């Protein structure tokens, strides 16, 4: 990847990610509380819906930037002239991007979610308590479950986003505009969000579980089984509506803003 493309992906991805995470933070808080083992009301209800936002503010830019730099680099590295291979290349690039981005995302997500279900505690208090009780390892609790959520999500979202853009571009005989890319992103994100909600619930339960419990071990299948055993299908899809809403809106803003900022930067350089 050329330096100008690297810088464009870095800044466009980071800017888009930070905008989305901060704008849609209240919906994310509601979703997390619906998925909490304590239940919505005991986790704070509609009170303190910006609890944990400092963690997101710190982690959003580097997380999104890391994803898109890896995604664009992998796409170029795996580039093929065959149109049939394009979806596979997009899937592989997105998966690699998620593995890298989760190294930054997971510590931020752990602290954010614990603050969201304990609105009386500050982000700093949550960080201190996690480090004191579990050490650095505690910040990465749920890394595997997050990757196992993000990879299937990206395997659906990004190839679908790219395919919808290609189809729209072919229909109108020119490249899609930023707003059209955003519409494609909203549809792709919402669809992927619905399909992967059970994995998101499992990830939330693992991150919020008491240290030493079976769920806290990080075994996704065990977490899914426990949710199914105690709450059934409703438990597996807890928070699906706010998750779909947030990610659809997020896809519209995130992928539209990413395309717009990246195009502008490459045009100016």
Curated annotation (Swiss-Prot):
Entries under Gene3D superfamilies matching the protein: Mitochondrial carrier domain
Segments traversing the membrane: 5-25, 49-69, 84-104, 141-161, 181-201, 237-257
Annotated gene: slc25a26
Catalytic activity: S-adenosyl-L-homocysteine(out) + S-adenosyl-L-methionine(in) = S-adenosyl-L-homocysteine(in) + S-adenosyl-L-methionine(out)
First and last residues of every Solcar repeat: 4-77, 85-167, 176-264
Role according to the record: Mitochondrial S-adenosyl-L-methionine/S-adenosyl-L-homocysteine antiporter. Mediates the exchange of cytosolic S-adenosyl-L-methionine, the predominant methyl-group donor for macromolecule methylation processes, for mitochondrial S-adenosylhomocysteine(SAH), a by-product of methylation reactions.
Similarity remark: Belongs to the mitochondrial carrier (TC 2.A.29) family.
Keyword annotations of the record: Antiport, Membrane, Mitochondrion, Mitochondrion inner membrane, Repeat, S-adenosyl-L-methionine, Transmembrane, Transmembrane helix, Transport
GO biological process terms, semicolon-separated: mitochondrial S-adenosyl-L-methionine transmembrane transport; S-adenosyl-L-methionine transport
Annotated source species: Xenopus tropicalis (Western clawed frog)
Entry-linked SUPFAM superfamilies: Mitochondrial carrier (SSF103506)
Any one Gene Ontology molecular-function term assigned to this protein's record: S-adenosyl-L-methionine:S-adenosyl-L-homocysteine antiporter activity
Membrane topology category: Multi-pass membrane protein
Subcellular location: Mitochondrion inner membrane
Protein name: Mitochondrial S-adenosylmethionine carrier protein
GO cellular component, one term: mitochondrial inner membrane
PANTHER family: S-ADENOSYLMETHIONINE MITOCHONDRIAL CARRIER PROTEIN
InterPro entries, per the entry: Mit_carrier (IPR002067), Mitochondrial_sb/sol_carrier (IPR018108), Mt_carrier_dom_sf (IPR023395)
């Amino acid at each position: 990847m050329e330096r100008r493309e690297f810088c464009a992906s870095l800044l466009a991805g980071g800017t888009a990610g930070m905008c989305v995470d901060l704008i849609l933070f209240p919906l994310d808080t509601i979703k997390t509380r619906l998925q909490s083992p304590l239940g919505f009301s005991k986790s704070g209800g509609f009170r303190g819906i910006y609890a944990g936002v400092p963690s997101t503010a710190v982690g959003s830019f580097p997380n999104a930037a890391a994803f898109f730099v890896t995604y664009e680099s992998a796409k170029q590295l795996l580039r093929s002239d065959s149109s049939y291979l394009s979806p596979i290349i997009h899937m592989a690039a997105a998966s690699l991007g998620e593995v890298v981005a989760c190294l930054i995302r997971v510590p931020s997500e752990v602290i954010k979610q614990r603050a969201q279900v304990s609105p009386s505690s500050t982000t700093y208090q949550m960080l201190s308590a996690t480090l004191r009780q579990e050490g650095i390892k505690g910040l990465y609790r749920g890394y595997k479950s997050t990757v196992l959520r993000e990879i299937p999500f990206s395997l659906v979202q990004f190839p679908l986003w790219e395919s919808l853009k290609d189809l729209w571009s072919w229909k109108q005989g020119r490249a899609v505009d930023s707003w059209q890319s955003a519409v494609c992103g909203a549809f792709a994100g919402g669809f992927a969000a619905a399909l992967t909600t059970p994995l998101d619930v499992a990830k939330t339960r693992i991150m919020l579980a008491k240290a030493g419990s079976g769920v806290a071990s990080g075994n996704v299948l065990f977490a899914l089984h426990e949710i199914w055993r105690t709450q059934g299908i409703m438990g597996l899809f807890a928070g699906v509506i706010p998750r779909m809403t947030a990610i659809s809106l997020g896809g519209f803003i995130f992928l539209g803003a990413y395309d717009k900022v990246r195009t502008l930067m490459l045009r100016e350089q």
